[in-house]
Amino acid sequence: MPEYKLQAPYTPKGDQPAAIKGLVGGVNDGEKFQTLLGATGTGKTFTIANLIAQTGRPALVLAHNKTLAAQLCNELREFFPDNAVEYFISYYDYYQPEAYVPVSDTYIAKTSSINEEIDMLRHSATRSLFERDDVIVVASISCIYGLGIPSEYLKASVKFQVGQSIDLRSCLRSLVSNQYTRNDIEISRGRFRVRGDVLEIGPAYDDRLVRLELFGDEVESISYVDPTTGEILNKLDSINIYPAKHFVTPKDRLDSAIKAIKKELKDRLEFLNQEGKLLEAQRLEQRTIYDLEMLKEVGYCNGVENYARHLSGREPGSAPECLIDYFPKDWLLLIDESHVTCPQLRAMYNGDQARKKVLIDHGFRLPSAADNRPLKDIEFWNKAKQTVFISATPGDWELSQSTKNIVEQVIRPTGVLDPLVEVRPTHGQVDDLLFEIRKRASKNQRILVTTLTKRMAEDLTDYLSENKIRVRYLHSEIHSIERIEIIQDLRLGEYDVLVGVNLLREGLDLPEVSLVVILDADKEGFLRAQRSLIQTIGRAARHVEGLALLYADKMTDSMAKAISETERRREIQNIYNIEHGITPKPAGKKASNSILSFLEISRRLNQDGSTDDFVDIADKLIEHSAKDSDSGVSLESLPELIEKLESKMKIKAKDLDFEKAAILRDRIKKLRHRLVGR
């Protein structure tokens, strides 16, 4: 059993001890499904951390979006600094899937942009699953998409040991076949170089270099090396170099795949010609033959994922291998905000197949392209072992699966009660809202306002801004990483009010928010359903002066149930506080930069843009990191940032733009000074 070392400055309190005991008992008894029904702010993540530590199993924590996944990853890394807490989300900065619109005869080619840092974290996750037992992977729904074959990925890895005799030429060929490229001038992730008796590799799973020093054919030493300074960071006895891509296809399987694709093409062309679809047949033949030539010559083609079934040797309709298949047999699945995440699991497959069917019917893809897909709902649950659903408002399906194995967590360790709920008439609501905002802002408290439409949110934001209110507007078109920055600025007090539609409900840890305002609360629908109202009200549940204002002209069933549940919890919490002599106190949790914020900074530094932009970023990080590691990018992240800045500095110097290069040099010195002071 792996040993998890849970580190926290506090012990379980309130309902946490009973919840932990109940969940651990259920896991040890082999219960397939359990539900942690935990009110907002009751410390569900800490409860889950204790569950993982006490059961000692590798765990997959599933979140429904990148923002929540980043928050969970950060929290779990704080609880388990000595264990492997990994982060696995979609590595696309931008993704436009291949599609065809028959009405306008418009073909849309696939376009995408891969975030190298997130790709590195994905590789780090699978590496940890192969090499360690104490692994927690925090993932988004993207983990149910195909991810190569774990056994082939592991088999293709190259192992080096000190004292081992190797054939250097053979090793280099193995690296190339594993999709590493040789570059003796500049080395980075996915590259290697040879200098005399020294082989340096940029592994896919790390931003450090691996240096192998040889004496003849013998490996004399193995070490991790700083890619910028060349400084040896630590020595190793052995190391596995995993492929640069998760999709590994041996030569014999590639040959078999090409034969299978040719056979499928022949059968499909016969079918299309019999149906009189001559244009579709010609289109399919032309595209597929070109792809086959590319596969034969270079082992790759654009859209190669559409041939994934053949390349992996799967049967038609069979489930693809995904992240779950990299886990050992005995693992634990934890689904956060399950009332949102579980419906997502069910929807992913249907949405993917609808798009693929159009492409197949019109001759853009072979029928086997439909097997390049996410898992079906039933396939996912067949792969899953023991599951714990986590939500303040679990869905009916989760509750029905858990039956008697439902653990409730209502008491907050801080003693803070659920917010008071007031229903006020809509007449004069804007002026009333303005008064409440000013009252809260004067106390340095934050306010969330939810509307039904984007237009209403925009108009309200403009009105509040005209009345000298520091306000921002959050909408669905904002990139997930930028969304984190907006929420971060709210916590740091850059502004007081955040207006949104459906972006403020689940999983956001905002202890500074004391007032939540719900406009048009009596308009029944998805955004004003019982669960949505409870979740939105819960955004003020971390503040001692928490208040939820519902503007409505009538009391709907959803409103009545949401208010009743909030009052029930509030009464339980109040009685507990009185019996134990507890005085509610604020959570006092500092705002901290998420892992995604740093990845976004790295992405912007990698893009072509004005030097002033990334100099400003460096200045901001210097300012934040000088305060303390919680208010800015962590010190552990600074080496990679320095490397990015140094790369830009060299480019400017090469372009003879010495003035801007000197500015960057000065910023780098300040960041290095911060590192030395650790």
Curated annotation (Swiss-Prot):
One of its GO terms (biological process) is SOS response. It is found in: Cytoplasm. InterPro entries: Helicase/UvrB_N, Helicase_ATP-bd, Helicase_C-like, P-loop_NTPase, UVR_dom, UVR_dom_sf, UvrB, UvrB_inter. Keywords: ATP-binding, Cytoplasm, DNA damage, DNA excision, DNA repair, Excision nuclease, Helicase, Hydrolase, Nucleotide-binding, SOS response. A motif (Beta-hairpin) lies at residues 91-114. Residues 639-674 form the UVR domain. GO terms for molecular function: ATP binding; ATP hydrolysis activity; DNA binding; excinuclease ABC activity; helicase activity. CDD domains: DEXHc_UvrB (cd17916), SF2_C_UvrB (cd18790). Residues 25-176 form the Helicase ATP-binding domain. One of its GO terms (cellular component) is cytoplasm. Residues 429-591 form the Helicase C-terminal domain. It comes from the Bacteria. PANTHER family: UVRABC SYSTEM PROTEIN B. The beta-hairpin motif is involved in DNA binding. The UvrABC repair system catalyzes the recognition and processing of DNA lesions. A damage recognition complex composed of 2 UvrA and 2 UvrB subunits scans DNA for abnormalities. Upon binding of the UvrA(2)B(2) complex to a putative damaged site, the DNA wraps around one UvrB monomer. DNA wrap is dependent on ATP binding by UvrB and probably causes local melting of the DNA helix, facilitating insertion of UvrB beta-hairpin between the DNA strands. Then UvrB probes one DNA strand for the presence of a lesion. Forms a heterotetramer with UvrA during the search for lesions. Interacts with UvrC in an incision complex. NCBIfam families: PRK05298.1 (NF003673), uvrb (TIGR00631). HAMAP family: UvrB. This is UvrABC system protein B. The gene is uvrB.
